[in-house]
């Protein structure tokens, strides 16, 4: 009995460590959103110009997720995790030392390489290492790590940047990654590659219209979100005219609301996943359309941020659960594609927000983001009516 208890405890420790790693990887992806103004000031650039860093990072992840996953498909997973963490940490040291914006972008590309591999294997590893009968809870823990990156990681990164400089934010993330790496080395057993799929999996996946429709929905809705979210920090300060501290509080509120979204999805996701996702997309559409009108009041912006955060967490969880349900025979390939497609949306949204801010007005980012959000809402209704049984039954 003791051995059983210990083994379950170790299994949960492994999953928790992976969740911490997910927190760190998501924090470093999101944290520049809260540091754009400081980085721009440091390199004497416009905030919108610095924002292109978000697009470069996201599109490198999108471009490299599948190739890297296929290149490493036969690599033992413990060794692979150690290698990608070394690249991740070294790249953050370079971010800390970066003497020009170009060097900073190069360091972020290194982080993106590690990111591309990490997110293509994490969900399947969490499922493998979970105690018997606890796969859903293991995935929920990974999702919680992701949510906490929004709740704690991004605001804390911004606070560190405000008081100690943006370089210290990246350095602190590197230190956190080093501690996590040491834990992974101690806790993880040898993990031979399993169910990783190969190029042979691609035609099979591409012949699944329900899966392809989910991928298309993902890229459109993520583009909508990041058109506005990428520039929310300068929007709050320069358009709404509120303080830097309020911008930090707003990011904390938006991220914290994601926990509520996670709880809602956890309670209702198995039975009503499609309805939840469509409702969340409708909520996102309303939030984006009301972003500028709400900018006249801190309370209005705060309330809007809560609903925005809830909506995006439900959307993110819903998309991931459906992808895993529709591709159980090639989870790594399917998740690599999902990670790549998600990041195409991030990069596209950040680029649209960048162009709107540079050539039109930053005040319009909400209205522009509402356009793809409306398209995503219509598409979600169409595909969930077209494949209601497939998606809901397999999700359960």
Swiss-Prot record:
Single GO term (MF): carbohydrate transmembrane transporter activity
UniProt keywords, alphabetically: Cell inner membrane, Cell membrane, Membrane, Sugar transport, Transmembrane, Transmembrane helix, Transport
Key word Transport present: yes
Membrane topology field: Multi-pass membrane protein
Cell compartments where the protein resides: Cell inner membrane
InterPro entries linked: MFS (IPR011701), MFS_dom (IPR020846), MFS_Efflux_Transporters (IPR050189), MFS_trans_sf (IPR036259), Sugar_effux_transptr_put (IPR023495)
Bilayer-crossing regions: 15-35, 50-70, 81-101, 103-123, 136-156, 170-190, 209-229, 246-266, 275-295, 299-319, 333-353, 364-384
GO annotation, cellular component aspect: plasma membrane
HAMAP family: MFS_SotB (MF_00517)
Annotated family: Belongs to the major facilitator superfamily. SotB (TC 2.A.1.2) family.
Purpose: Involved in the efflux of sugars. The physiological role may be the reduction of the intracellular concentration of toxic sugars or sugar metabolites.
Protein name in UniProt: Probable sugar efflux transporter
Originating gene: sotB
């Amino acid at each position: 009995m003791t051995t059983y208890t210990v083994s379950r405890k170790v299994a949960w420790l492994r999953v928790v460590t992976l969740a911490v790693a997910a927190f760190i990887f998501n924090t470093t992806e999101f944290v520049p959103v809260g540091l754009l103004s400081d980085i721009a000031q440091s390199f004497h650039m416009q905030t919108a110009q610095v924002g292109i860093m978000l697009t470069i990072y996201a599109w490198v992840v999108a471009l490299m997720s599948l190739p890297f996953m296929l290149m490493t498909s036969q690599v033992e997973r413990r060794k692979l995790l150690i290698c990608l963490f070394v690249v991740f940490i070294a790249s953050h040291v370079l971010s800390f030392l970066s003497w020009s914006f170009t060097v900073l972008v190069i360091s972020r590309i290194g982080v993106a390489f590690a990111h591309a591999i990490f997110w293509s294997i994490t969900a399947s590893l969490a499922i493998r290492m979970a105690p018997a009968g606890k796969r859903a809870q293991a995935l929920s823990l990974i999702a919680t790590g992701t949510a906490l990156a929004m709740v704690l990681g991004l605001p804390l990164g911004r606070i560190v940047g405000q008081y100690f400089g943006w370089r210290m934010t990246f350095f602190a993330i590197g230190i956190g990654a080093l501690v996590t790496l040491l834990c992974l080395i101690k806790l993880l057993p040898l993990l031979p590659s399993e169910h990783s799929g190969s190029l042979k999996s691609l035609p099979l996946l591409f012949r699944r219209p329900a899966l392809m429709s989910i991928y298309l929905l993902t890229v459109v809705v993520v583009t909508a979100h990041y058109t506005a979210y990428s520039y929310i920090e300068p929007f709050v300060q320069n358009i709404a005219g509120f303080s830097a501290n309020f911008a930090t509080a707003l990011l904390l509120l938006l991220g914290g609301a994601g926990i509520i979204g996670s709880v809602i999805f956890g309670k209702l996701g198995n039975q009503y996943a499609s309805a939840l996702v469509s409702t969340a997309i409708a909520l996102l559409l309303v939030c984006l359309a009301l972003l500028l009108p709400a900018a006249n009041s801190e309370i209005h912006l705060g309330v809007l941020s809560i609903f925005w955060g809830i909506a995006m967490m439900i959307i993110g969880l819903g998309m991931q659960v459906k992808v895993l349900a529709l591709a159980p025979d090639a989870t790594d390939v399917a998740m690599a594609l999902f990670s790549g497609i998600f990041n195409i949306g991030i990069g596209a949204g950040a680029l649209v927000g960048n162009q709107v801010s540079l050539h039109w007005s930053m005040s319009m980012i909400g209205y522009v983001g509402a356009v793809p959000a409306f398209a995503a809402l219509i598409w979600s209704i169409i595909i969930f009516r077209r494949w209601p049984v497939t998606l809901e039954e397999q999700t359960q």
